[in-house]
Amino acid sequence: MALSLEEVRRIAQLARLRLSEEEERTFAGQLSAILDHVRQLEELDVTAVEPMTHALAAGELPALREDAVRASLAPEEATAAAPAREGTAFKVPRIIE
C-alpha cells in the first residue's frame, strides 16, 4: 500500500519539515517501501524465536566508554532556534491523544 502525498505532507508537517513537490514524491516512494518491508516482517512466524532484550547477545556487546563530563550547550542555546519553546523545553504539538 503506497502512502499518499497527503499523508507525506502530514508527516512532514508533524516533523516541521518543508518539502518540495519532488521531495514529497520521493519520500512517498521511500516511506511506502519501508512500510512494505515492515509488513513483510509482520508476516513472519516468530513464535519459536526466543525474545531478546538487546540486538546483540550479552557476550557480543561492544566495549562501552566510561562516562565523562564534557562541555555542552546551555539549555537556552540548545533551544534558541526552536520554532516554539516553553522555558528551556521544546514545545511540540500533541500527536498522541
Swiss-Prot record:
Its EC number is 6.3.5.-. GO terms for molecular function: asparaginyl-tRNA synthase (glutamine-hydrolyzing) activity; ATP binding; glutaminyl-tRNA synthase (glutamine-hydrolyzing) activity. The keyword Lipid metabolism does not apply. Heterotrimer of A, B and C subunits. It comes from the Bacteria. InterPro entries: Asp/Glu-ADT_sf_sub_c, GatC. This is Aspartyl/glutamyl-tRNA(Asn/Gln) amidotransferase subunit C. It catalyses: L-glutamyl-tRNA(Gln) + L-glutamine + ATP + H2O = L-glutaminyl-tRNA(Gln) + L-glutamate + ADP + phosphate + H(+); L-aspartyl-tRNA(Asn) + L-glutamine + ATP + H2O = L-asparaginyl-tRNA(Asn) + L-glutamate + ADP + phosphate + 2 H(+). Belongs to the GatC family. Pfam families: GatC.
